[in-house]
């Protein structure tokens, strides 16, 4: 990697690895640093003698001569969501026992993922190297596999801290986790491996988002994509197009955005093909790849513009490339997947596009640029045309596209836009299995009136009213009617302001969706 502005280089770090083991043992017999018990409010019910009615809590409490009941009462632990207490009590094989509140019940992937994050939190706080997790209430047989996957994912992601740009960083101490009461055997082990593969894909996505724009230029993003392909060269090929090659493909919309930057654009195309068997379905995942967005001549100014966070404007590409990494590990059969990113910067210079310019996309449609800060859709336009030309059956694009979607849905969920009910059902089901939140928004065709231009086929933004919808309608102009297509506006959930970190949102849903379209 060449020297960057400020001479900044990230510390080379590998993701922290954890050994997961599924066990069916008596919790009293477990030996290690911290035993974590997930507890609902109902589990804490006591009989007339102030003894726990729950079998697991009763057994542990009896082994501790009533200390667990006594201390949990003194700590005012009621099992409410997010509540936790860590106790150091003599008499168990574990050095500590932690009670984690689950509320009324725990059943959804989101709830189990949150429990996993809580396990990570108490393990870090106690500097434990080994942990076990068990629920006071048993898990239903039909939900054990999905639950164990979400739990493991929560632990891996909960332990993640990005210390690459700190002069001193500390790695988590947790190395081994035993998961008790969720079953054992090949199916459980497969689910645990799947959870790890997806989680490390999410972490890769987070690291891409967190990388500052003076480090993660379009060229470096392309390098990172090429590394994924070379790591899994048995199933991946990479084609990185330079500016001249993009000109030959008439990508005028994409290149107009890139024109102002000293860092040239790089168009990324990875292709996954299964190692064995025939291909039944061809998919494309298209991610917005603005490694920095100044807004161009419509520069981002004023309170709330968050220009300092515009390194995350490549969050869509982070989701796509994180999914590529996970799919390289999982190797789903029967499905071919194209990963496409039009990477560039939106900067200001004498060579940049101006408000009022008319540009031409690779499908021949002309666009009047009435706002240079509505640039993501211009890059996606040519990326979507390119994706359709690969002969794919379905396309999902992801982008931090509009503030309007954040106003509508907040920061916990993304909006989805598609004319296909079938595709909507597929992707929403995948998001529910992965624990990510999506909400289907309308594609109101009458709003296209706001996108009409007097001098070109369309303008690139229709104003504030219905802004996320008109943005999706704009993208629709560059997708073949023969291809099922969905747009995901992930501007809200791309960033966790409390943790000051990218989330890797979208990776898990994309992998689940690809899996569902495979023949596995």
UniProtKB/Swiss-Prot annotation:
<keyword id="KW-0963">Cytoplasm</keyword>
<dbReference type="GO" id="GO:0006508">
    <property type="term" value="P:proteolysis"/>
</dbReference>
<feature type="binding site">
    <location>
        <position position="375"/>
    </location>
    <ligand>
        <name>Mn(2+) 2</name>
    </ligand>
</feature>
<keyword id="KW-0031">Aminopeptidase</keyword>
<dbReference type="GO" id="GO:0004177">
    <property type="term" value="F:aminopeptidase activity"/>
</dbReference>
<feature type="binding site">
    <location>
        <position position="293"/>
    </location>
    <ligand>
        <name>Mn(2+) 1</name>
    </ligand>
</feature>
<comment type="function">
    <text>Functions as a molecular chaperone to protect proteins from heat-induced damage.</text>
</comment>
<dbReference type="InterPro" id="IPR000819">
    <property type="entry name" value="Peptidase_M17_C"/>
</dbReference>
<dbReference type="GO" id="GO:0030145">
    <property type="term" value="F:manganese ion binding"/>
</dbReference>
<protein>
    <recommendedName>
        <fullName>Leucine aminopeptidase 1</fullName>
        <ecNumber>3.4.11.1</ecNumber>
        <ecNumber>3.4.11.5</ecNumber>
    </recommendedName>
</protein>
<dbReference type="GO" id="GO:0016805">
    <property type="term" value="F:dipeptidase activity"/>
</dbReference>
<feature type="active site">
    <location>
        <position position="377"/>
    </location>
</feature>
<dbReference type="InterPro" id="IPR023042">
    <property type="entry name" value="Peptidase_M17_leu_NH2_pept"/>
</dbReference>
<comment type="similarity">
    <text>Belongs to the peptidase M17 family.</text>
</comment>
<dbReference type="GO" id="GO:0005773">
    <property type="term" value="C:vacuole"/>
</dbReference>
<dbReference type="GO" id="GO:0005829">
    <property type="term" value="C:cytosol"/>
</dbReference>
<feature type="binding site">
    <location>
        <position position="288"/>
    </location>
    <ligand>
        <name>Mn(2+) 1</name>
    </ligand>
</feature>
<feature type="binding site">
    <location>
        <position position="375"/>
    </location>
    <ligand>
        <name>Mn(2+) 1</name>
    </ligand>
</feature>
<comment type="function">
    <text>Presumably involved in the processing and regular turnover of intracellular proteins. Catalyzes the removal of unsubstituted N-terminal amino acids from various peptides. Possesses leucine aminopeptidase activity against the model substrate leucine-amido methyl coumarin. Possesses Cys-Gly dipeptidase activity. In addition, can cleave Cys-Leu and Leu-Cys dipeptides.</text>
</comment>
<keyword id="KW-0479">Metal-binding</keyword>
<dbReference type="InterPro" id="IPR008283">
    <property type="entry name" value="Peptidase_M17_N"/>
</dbReference>
<dbReference type="InterPro" id="IPR043472">
    <property type="entry name" value="Macro_dom-like"/>
</dbReference>
<keyword id="KW-0143">Chaperone</keyword>
<feature type="active site">
    <location>
        <position position="300"/>
    </location>
</feature>
<dbReference type="GO" id="GO:0070006">
    <property type="term" value="F:metalloaminopeptidase activity"/>
</dbReference>
<dbReference type="GO" id="GO:0034605">
    <property type="term" value="P:cellular response to heat"/>
</dbReference>
<comment type="subunit">
    <text>Homohexamer (dimer of homotrimers).</text>
</comment>
<feature type="binding site">
    <location>
        <position position="373"/>
    </location>
    <ligand>
        <name>Mn(2+) 2</name>
    </ligand>
</feature>
<keyword id="KW-0645">Protease</keyword>
<keyword id="KW-0346">Stress response</keyword>
<dbReference type="Pfam" id="PF00883">
    <property type="entry name" value="Peptidase_M17"/>
</dbReference>
<feature type="binding site">
    <location>
        <position position="313"/>
    </location>
    <ligand>
        <name>Mn(2+) 1</name>
    </ligand>
</feature>
<dbReference type="Pfam" id="PF02789">
    <property type="entry name" value="Peptidase_M17_N"/>
</dbReference>
<keyword id="KW-0464">Manganese</keyword>
<feature type="binding site">
    <location>
        <position position="293"/>
    </location>
    <ligand>
        <name>Mn(2+) 2</name>
    </ligand>
</feature>
<dbReference type="GO" id="GO:0009570">
    <property type="term" value="C:chloroplast stroma"/>
</dbReference>
<dbReference type="GO" id="GO:0044183">
    <property type="term" value="F:protein folding chaperone"/>
</dbReference>
<dbReference type="InterPro" id="IPR011356">
    <property type="entry name" value="Leucine_aapep/pepB"/>
</dbReference>
<keyword id="KW-0378">Hydrolase</keyword>
